[in-house]
């Protein structure tokens, strides 16, 4: 999620997205959240790292803005070595990478591909590229 991993598979498997999203959000404790991608990556590797193998296509969704926290590139590289491929869907264009608290200039070389995905057309194109 923002600073931690949240399992949402069951909610989305059993409900339409417009119902599942509020269910997931209600489950989260109230408060201020500050993006910490490194912490999220560490939790993901700890909980699910063993499930990532050469059959896995890992898709990371987010803008790569990290509030100047440790980006944990070592964990992205670890996942890339284990997975078939690692792809990043980012709503921001490449010109915004590296501005402010964006770590995308560091993350981009550590993954197999980065696709700008800020609308349905771009999402469709990015998903189509996964199957080429």
Predicted regions and their residues:
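Von Willebrand factor type A / integrin I
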Residues: 77-132
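Von Willebrand factor
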Residues: 1-56, 58, 93, 98-99
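DG-centered beta-turn motif at the end of beta-strands
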Residues: 56-67, 112
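Acidic, Ser/Thr-rich peripheral helices and adjacent loops at domain boundaries
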Residues: 10-31, 106-114
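Cofactor-binding loop segments of dinucleotide-utilizing enzymes, especially the Rossmann-like FAD-
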Residues: 1-3, 63, 91
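Conserved alpha-helical "signature site"
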Residues: 69-72
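Alpha-helical scaffolding segments of alpha/beta enzyme cores, especially the outer helices
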Residues: 39, 43, 74-81
């Amino acid at each position: 999620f923002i600073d931690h991993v949240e399992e949402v598979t069951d909610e989305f498997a059993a409900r339409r997205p417009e119902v599942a999203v509020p269910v997931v959000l209600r489950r989260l404790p109230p408060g201020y959240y500050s993006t910490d991608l490194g912490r999220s990556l560490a939790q993901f590797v700890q909980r699910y790292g063993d499930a990532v193998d050469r059959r896995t296509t890992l898709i990371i969704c987010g803008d790569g803005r990290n509030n100047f926290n440790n980006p944990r590139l070592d964990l992205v590289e670890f996942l890339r070595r284990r997975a078939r491929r690692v792809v990043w869907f980012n709503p921001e264009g490449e010109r915004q990478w590296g501005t402010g608290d964006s770590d995308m200039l560091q993350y981009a070389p550590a993954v197999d591909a980065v696709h700008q995905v800020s609308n349905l057309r771009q999402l469709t194109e990015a998903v189509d590229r996964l199957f080429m």
